[in-house]
Amino acid sequence: MTLRKLGAMVLAAVLAAGLLPAGALAARNEKMDADQMDIPAIIEAKDAEGTVNVYHWWTAGGEKDAIESVVDGFSNTYPNIRAKSNAIPGGAGGAMVMKVKVLQQAGKSPETFQAHPGQEIEPYLTSGLLLNLNQVWDYASIGTRALPGLEDLCTASDGNKYIVPIGIHKSNVIFYNIHVFEKYGVEIPDHENITWDEFWSICDQLAAAMPDGEYPIDLGDRKGWPACQVFEDIMMGTDPQIYEDFINGNYNVEDVTNVLSTYSRLMEYVAPDHSSRDWYETSGQLVA
């Protein structure tokens, strides 16, 4: 089953049986019991009518294409339902979260909206407006197909699932262009768990071989959050406990200073105009 088909099924499920005054991930200020609904029958009802709003923050490049593919898949499967893609730009969804909260308070909760798995969904539970998607998980056998640990992340504190995975976002990954290594005669390590010394050696070799205007590492952090994620990744890669202590205000100055030193050294290899570009612009340059 493709993500496009799964996305269409999810939107159908949250539409909740021919559009009750608005069944969905965020039912319009009306409490509903998803366990009493026949979600498989809802998914199979290809002649259902109505409108479903999809609020999200995927507005750039490939991510925009991805969400549009999901919405198009829904529209093709349920031609009598109008699917509206409502893009709210803003790094990592911050602006969209505020928009959803405003709509909820105004009694106009969207039928479905994007969210990260994990703790991000918890604040919405206090409103009692979320429709659980347990039956969707069962119907599509998502648990058996998801990456290890993902089902737990998508399970809320009350034991229900209010979110399904549509994409995969993973941090702490460095992408490299093999053609650049070949062009400048730098050997690509043939093993995992590369040490920092090995990484610095690679950066030094590339820096020495590259002409002016080219740099071993690139980063597009015009909106700030990519740089924050790099810092977090370095901290967690150094020692997960340092990260836990840091976010809980119990950090050790020496530990954090060492992390900052590593971060500072990494940035020495980054193109100086990194803060003028967005992440997707830099990604495009990497694969160009």
Please give the residue ranges for each predicted region.
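Extracytoplasmic/periplasmic solute-binding protein
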Residues: S157-G167, N172, E198-N248
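Extracytoplasmic "Venus flytrap"/periplasmic binding protein-like
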Residues: G73-G149, L153, E182-G185
